[in-house]
C-alpha cells in the first residue's frame, strides 16, 4: 500500500487514507512547519522590497549629486568666482538710509519715528534763553554778578473769586487782593436764659406791651 508524503513536514505517513491525513494535519508539529514555511517566504519578500527601496533612494541621491556638481562647475567657470549676492537689509523707520542726506532741523518728522529727546538745559548756560517771566539767576563765567530784581516786579498769580461772605462775618482784603481769614460767629447749642425771674419773668416781659394797650 503506498504511503503519503508531507512536503511541510518532510516525512512519510504510515497510511495513505483520509483519516490519517486529517489526523496528521491537525497535529501541532504540522501546523508549526506550515507556519515556518510561509514565514520564510514573507521574510524573503520583505527583504527584497527593502533592497529595492534602498536602491531607488541611492539612485535619487546620485542624481542630486550630479546636478549639484554641474551647478558648482557652472559657478566656477565665471571669472573671479564672485560670491552670491546677499539679500538687502531693509532699514527700520528710525534708521537713516545709507547715501541719503540728513534731514534738516525744521523738517517734519517721518511717520512712525520717535522725536529726539533733548536734555534739559542748565539755567544760565550760554545759548539758552531763560523761561518767560523768570529772570536769569546765574551769570556766565567771568561776568559780574547782577543784582537781585525786586519781588514786586515778578508777576503775581491770578486771584480766585471768593464766595460772598456769610452774614455776621467780616473779611478785610489784603494788599495782594487775597481775602483774610473769615471769623464766623460760634453756634451755641444751649443759650443761657435770664438769671432772674425764670420762666415767669420771661412771659411777663413778653405780655407787657399788650397789657398797656
From Swiss-Prot:
Its main location: nucleus. GO terms for molecular function: mRNA binding; pre-mRNA 5'-splice site binding; U1 snRNA binding; zinc ion binding. Residues 167-180 have a biased composition (Low complexity). A zinc finger (Matrin-type) spans 4-36. It is found in: Nucleus. The keyword Nucleus applies. Keywords: Metal-binding, Nucleus, Ribonucleoprotein, RNA-binding, Zinc, Zinc-finger. The keyword Metal-binding applies. Residues 143-166 have a biased composition (Pro residues). Disulfide bonds: none annotated. One of its GO terms (biological process) is spliceosomal snRNP assembly. Pfam families: zf-U1 (PF06220). Residues 143-213 are annotated as: Disordered. GO terms for cellular component: commitment complex; U1 snRNP; U2-type prespliceosome. U1 snRNP is composed of the 7 core Sm proteins B/B', D1, D2, D3, E, F and G that assemble in a heptameric protein ring on the Sm site of the small nuclear RNA to form the core snRNP, and at least 3 U1 snRNP-specific proteins U1-70K, U1-A and U1-C. U1-C interacts with U1 snRNA and the 5' splice-site region of the pre-mRNA. Belongs to the U1 small nuclear ribonucleoprotein C family. Component of the spliceosomal U1 snRNP, which is essential for recognition of the pre-mRNA 5' splice-site and the subsequent assembly of the spliceosome. U1-C is directly involved in initial 5' splice-site recognition for both constitutive and regulated alternative splicing. The interaction with the 5' splice-site seems to precede base-pairing between the pre-mRNA and the U1 snRNA. Stimulates commitment or early (E) complex formation by stabilizing the base pairing of the 5' end of the U1 snRNA and the 5' splice-site region. This is U1 small nuclear ribonucleoprotein C.
Amino acid at each position: 500500500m503506498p504511503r503519503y508524503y508531507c512536503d511541510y513536514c518532510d516525512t512519510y505517513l504510515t497510511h495513505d487514507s483520509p483519516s490519517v491525513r486529517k489526523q496528521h494535519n491537525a497535529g501541532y508539529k504540522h501546523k508549526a512547519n506550515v507556519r515556518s514555511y510561509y514565514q520564510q517566504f514573507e521574510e524573503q519578500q520583505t527583504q527584497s522590497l527593502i533592497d529595492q527601496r534602498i536602491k531607488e533612494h541611492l539612485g535619487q541621491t546620485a542624481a542630486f549629486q550630479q546636478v549639484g556638481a554641474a551647478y558648482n562647475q557652472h559657478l566656477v567657470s565665471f571669472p573671479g568666482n564672485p560670491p552670491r549676492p546677499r539679500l538687502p537689509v531693509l532699514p527700520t523707520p528710525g534708521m537713516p538710509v545709507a547715501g541719503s542726506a540728513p534731514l534738516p532741523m525744521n523738517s517734519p518728522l517721518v511717520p512712525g519715528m520717535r522725536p529726539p529727546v533733548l536734555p534739559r538745559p542748565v539755567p544760565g548756560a550760554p545759548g539758552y534763553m531763560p523761561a518767560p517771566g523768570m529772570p536769569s539767576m546765574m551769570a556766565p563765567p567771568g561776568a559780574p554778578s547782577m543784582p537781585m530784581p525786586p519781588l514786586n516786579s515778578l508777576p503775581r498769580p491770578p486771584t480766585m473769586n471768593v464766595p460772598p461772605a456769610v452774614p455776621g462775618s467780616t473779611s478785610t482784603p489784603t494788599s495782594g487782593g487775597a481775602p483774610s481769614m473769615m471769623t464766623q460767629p460760634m453756634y451755641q447749642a444751649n443759650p443761657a436764659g435770664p438769671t432772674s425771674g425764670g420762666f415767669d419773668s420771661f412771659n411777663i416781659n413778653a405780655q407787657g406791651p399788650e397789657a398797656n394797650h
